[in-house]
From Swiss-Prot:
GO terms for molecular function: [isocitrate dehydrogenase (NADP+)] kinase activity; AMP binding; ATP binding; phosphoprotein phosphatase activity; protein serine/threonine kinase activity. Keywords: ATP-binding, Cytoplasm, Glyoxylate bypass, Hydrolase, Kinase, Nucleotide-binding, Protein phosphatase, Serine/threonine-protein kinase, Transferase, Tricarboxylic acid cycle. Pfam families: AceK_kinase, AceK_regulatory. GO terms for cellular component: cytoplasm. It comes from Aeromonas salmonicida (strain A449). Its EC number is 2.7.11.5, 3.1.3.-. This is Isocitrate dehydrogenase kinase/phosphatase. Belongs to the AceK family.
Amino acid sequence: MQQPLEQAVAETILQRFESFYSRFLEITQGSKSRFENSDWLGVQLAGRERIRLYDHHVGATTALIKQMMGEHHATQELLKRVKGAFSDLLPRCDNFEVAESFFNSVYRRIFRHRNIRDENLYIHPFRSRGEHPDLSALLRVYRTDLTHLPQTLSQMLGDYSFTLPYEDKQRDIVDIHRHLAENGPQILHEEPFAIELLKEVFYRNKGAYLVGLIRVKGQVFPFILPLLSTGQSIYVDTVIFEPELASIVVGFARAYFMVYAPVPALFVVFLRQIMPHKPDYEIYNAIGCQKHGKTELYRHYQQHLAQSREQFVIAPGIKGMVMSVFTLPSYDVVFKVIKDEFTPPKDVSHEQVRAKYRLVKQHDRVGRMADTQEFTNFEFPLDRISPELLAELKTVAPSALTITSDKLVIKHLYTERKMIPLNLYLDKADEQQTRLALEEYGNAIKQLAAANIFPGDMLFKNFGVTRHGRVVFYDYDEICYMTECNFRQIPPPRYPEDEWSAEPWYSVAPNDIFPEEFATFLLQKPQVREIMMQLHKEMFDANYWKMLQSNIKVGVFEDVYPYRRKKRFKFQRGG
């Protein structure tokens, strides 16, 4: 007897999801070998391939479903029955949370993101794991105290096998023990404790991370050991037990971790314990499930919307030439809409802007570029849109809007973590805050450049300050690869009057960049000039940028750590 069409379609979607996630895990599993072999180019290529997997599989699944439906076509009634059949299949799927998101993506793709009915989507989770799912199979647990910690650490490091030996395991054990004894929570001196470590290693860039927590007397502290490779051996770079630093390590401005997680929801439950203030969607993003992170973000947004009463407003700061940005004051996210026409002198197309955002999604963000999510036909309650914001959107992006009696629907937008624009931060900062922010700003530009990203527009308004005081770039319409730039020094004037001319006395090609000119628009305030020239003088010299380009061209991958240099054991030992 032939299966009902809805049953066949539901089973096909689930099979295609399982095929996608199997390939996702296969790419992830290669991380250990890439780390052991210092295959840093392979790390980048694998990251890009894994990000592209989801859309590829959703597209192929959508095409197959349309073929299966044939003359029946995809009606809302049929898709409602498909969802019912899919829900019946979910109990057999361990990774049902991400499977729901995959179903949503296929449904939206079939209807080209139009005439979407919430009841045919998994707006709310269909299944729940309960508040306290069993995590024991994921963990190694070590019960110890500060006196016996060295023996525990020796066992712990031995439990994680690599083909490379430790450079000096005993030295690393001494460093971890010393650092925890001198700087760790005081309660570790007073009580025995348990260290719970995830069995699976987290890989990102040049690092491998053992990720876990310390549990003592009802309190929980992070316990993260970053491992680095010399090419011949590995070593522990530091120990992280500070909640703020753990949150930065699993940050929204970094490349996604590669961690073998057949059931990512269980990893999220565990990580939530050491980062209770980080929303689930950011944790899903961090472990590479960014498409399900998008689902979780939407659910988080809906929940916040229901619990708040204020209106969406234009975001603080200087208005962008390419984007109109707005936010809900109590919500930690901004919404960015591409304008219909760009403010001169911007000379890019809509498709070029979207291509830049795709580039950022697939590139190593080195902790300095905010992650984004892209939405189509995003709905807002009309009565929650302030009159000023509605007038602004009608003026700058009318083609992106559909307005009904009770809804504002925006055809296309990006979401991004809310930060304080650096220019606004500097306006209110004292001398110490200014110095730290400018140090961060210069470091952000240098680290992006070392990762082959030139920001293009380096004005302070295009950078944000996070709650942890880090400076992150968030305006992508002018970014390009460093290797595409032609850094030049300004030629000397031919005649004295050249310096007073409104036009340059030298030819300028489209990709020509003159770092000396950065000072003109960045260093207008004497205090800023003084600090920048102390900390980042080389940024204004074309030779510095050419040197970075040379490193990139010969395959030098710079070390970028998600913690300050003084946190590294090597630095503490005077190395």
